[in-house]
């Protein structure tokens, strides 16, 4: 799994336990994110480090996933270490930056 370096990702794979929604969002798997949400997964759930699905999608450049999460109530102002907007800015994902700023 490729994630940008801004993520609070452990060095050891044994420590990497992402919640279902965060995992699928980080990979840009729109259909899996839709399934998770349909199955009642909390759109604002986070991993142990406080990293949300919206942050994962924004950081990794998945605009379609970002939009789906926002449409389903993701908190765009939530800040773990960084907000989703800050992560998108650091990763230079212009379309996501513009979308999040338009909200």
Task: Map each language-model feature to its residues.
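Intrinsically disordered, low-complexity regulatory segments in ankyrin-centric signaling systems
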Residues: 1-39
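Leucine-rich solenoid repeat scaffolds
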Residues: 77-103
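Conserved ankyrin/ankyrin-like repeat signature
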Residues: 32, 64-65, 95-96
């Amino acid at each position: 799994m490729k994630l940008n370096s801004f993520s609070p990702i452990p060095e050891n794979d044994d420590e990497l336990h992402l919640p279902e929604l965060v995992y699928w969002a980080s990979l840009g798997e729109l259909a899996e994110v839709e399934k998770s949400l349909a199955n009642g997964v909390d759109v604002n759930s986070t991993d142990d480090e406080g990293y949300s699905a919206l942050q994962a999608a924004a950081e990794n450049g998945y605009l379609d996933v970002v939009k789906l999460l926002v449409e389903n109530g993701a908190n765009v102002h939530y800040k773990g270490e960084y907000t989703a907007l800050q992560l998108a800015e650091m990763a230079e994902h212009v379309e996501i930056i513009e979308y999040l700023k338009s909200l």
